[in-house]
Amino acid sequence: MRNTSRVAILIVIVGVLLTLTHDYWGGKLLGIFSVLISCSVVFIAFVISLENRKPAQTIAWLAVLGSFPFLGFLFYLLFGRNYWQQRRFKKKAESDEAVLLKFQEPSPIAIERLPMAPHQRPLLHLAYRIGQHPVSLASQTAVLTNGEETFAAIFDELEKAQHHIHLEYYIVRHDEIGQKLKHVLMEKACQGVHVRFLYDAVGSWKLSNAYIEELRAAGVEMIPFSPVRLPFLSNQINFRNHRKIIVIDGGVGFVGGLNIGDEYLGKDEYFGFWRDTHLLIRGEAVRTLQLIFLQDWYYMTGERLLTPEYLSPPLIVEEGQGGVQLIAGGPDQKWEVIKQLYFAMITSAKRSIWVASPYFVPDEDILTALKVAALSGIDVRLLAPKRPDKKIVFYASRSYFPELLEAGVKIYEYEKGFLHSKVIVVDGELASIGTANMDMRSFHLNFEVNAFLYYTDSTNKLVNDFLEDFRHASPIDYVQFQQRPFRVRIVESVSRLLSPLL
């Protein structure tokens, strides 16, 4: 399969060269190229059918290949190859499993001590079974609302670091906030603190070499996650590390929606105010966040750091703060962990489901769960951005609005600035904060990490944040929304058609 893909890429290159030298060859060899492309397309269509993907994905791929053979062929090479994905991440999955079996303690005892309703307990058992990380009762959490509050807390904790600082980010910029982070990390490295920084090679592709080299010269280990040497000839532009993790001395951790960049402080002229949510964690649950980082670090460097100095019991926090569970999702896992936990949260609801997601492109399972909940009389609300970030995703999201509105889902468009929070609150008792959007990319392609909260004070804070956000949002009226121009509907429909491919 891998060799076939490389041969197919060679066919494309030859075709381009033949096109550029058309006058010289007289077009004689273009017929051969057309036959090769046609055979490749037929072969790919056959492979897609045998992979037993979801019907929506299969139909979308076959439609694109049939309508635009050449473009569809290229698109498949970049985004569609499941076989190479599975083979590529098999080794990571095996090493992750070995670490978990050695270092994770059983979770059912903690689950039984949580004061949860009987209908909610299956969610915890599911999370432990497919997520493989325990629920912690000896942890404290604090919701950090927006950039100023988040970065203030991060820098305050970084200054206190004595042994190690571990960072993992999708986007890192060398702007004002990025420079501030660089100077703090260089200072801590000079003090003898071990600083390890894993950044995504695609998300941070604009990060300057000078920035990286300055940190390395100061003793900071800067490692790119899954570098892409030939982005147009490799589907490595998918399967990105979308996680945002900081672990300090094994006892303090951060996770959430904010990357490292000035736009997250509202300094971008287009976006303006940036609405986001992050989470500060202290205590036992940080150990899980540490494990997730160390697994990713080992995958990229081959360096095992599974020693007591990194995995010893963290700061003692008394029980009684509710439960905290860190769950990692990614293409290296057998189950669609984040999606299945979202689904379980939605179907466990008795009173309310409030969702904030900047990129809302659900699959049929999540879409049906939301509609059924609303039709059952549950208060289902979706908070989405009114200002587009990625236009194709924005229009694809809006294509789902009519059927959701018709089912009784209340949809609000955030108007104060750009909404980037990735939060779910169910019945005011269960919540999720993290890096995963409610879209197919987060469900199937990206490496993500979410914190699931059970009966914590932080959940109450999230409810209050939602109420404040609704004040700065406008509800969408179903009748008025149906009157949008026909050309807009076409764009939405095409974007939605492409969404299973992206």
UniProtKB/Swiss-Prot annotation:
GO terms for cellular component: plasma membrane. It is found in: Cell membrane. The active site is at H242, K244, D249, H420, K422, D427. Its main location: membrane. The chain crosses the membrane at residues 7-27, 29-49, 59-79. It is an enzyme of class 2 (transferase). It comes from the Bacteria. HAMAP family: Cardiolipin_synth_Cls (MF_01916). This is Cardiolipin synthase. It comes from Geobacillus thermodenitrificans (strain NG80-2).
